Every structure is written in C-alpha cells, then in structure tokens.
Amino acid sequence: MMPETQLHVIARQMFERHGATAVAQAAQNARACESKGDAEQAKEWRHIEDAIKIMRGPHQS
C-alpha cells in the first residue's frame, strides 16, 4: 500500500484537475481495478475517493 501522504497528494491533484467530478473519477478507477481483480489498487483508489470527499466538504442545499 502506498503511503498515506502520497494518497493525499494524488487526491489533491485529482480534486484540482477534475473539480466536482474527481470523486466519480476515483470511484471509476477503483471499479476498473476491481474488475481486473486488483483489490489492493482498488483499495487505494477508494482511499483516494474518501480523501477527495473530505477536501470537497459537505454538500450544501
């Protein structure tokens, strides 16, 4: 598993690059890894997805 700091760097870069669609992009990457049978890589993408959600903050209505 990649270091926590590296996961957060990737999450921040994805959030800056993809904005509102960053969470969906990370989830799509996780599903692609799962479909290939790469559970460890999928777990890292899920972790990145969670970090992006924290950066994004709560939804406002």
Label each PLM-derived region with a short phrase.
Residues 1-28, 32, 36, 40-43, ...:
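Long, non-catalytic architectural segments outside compact domain cores
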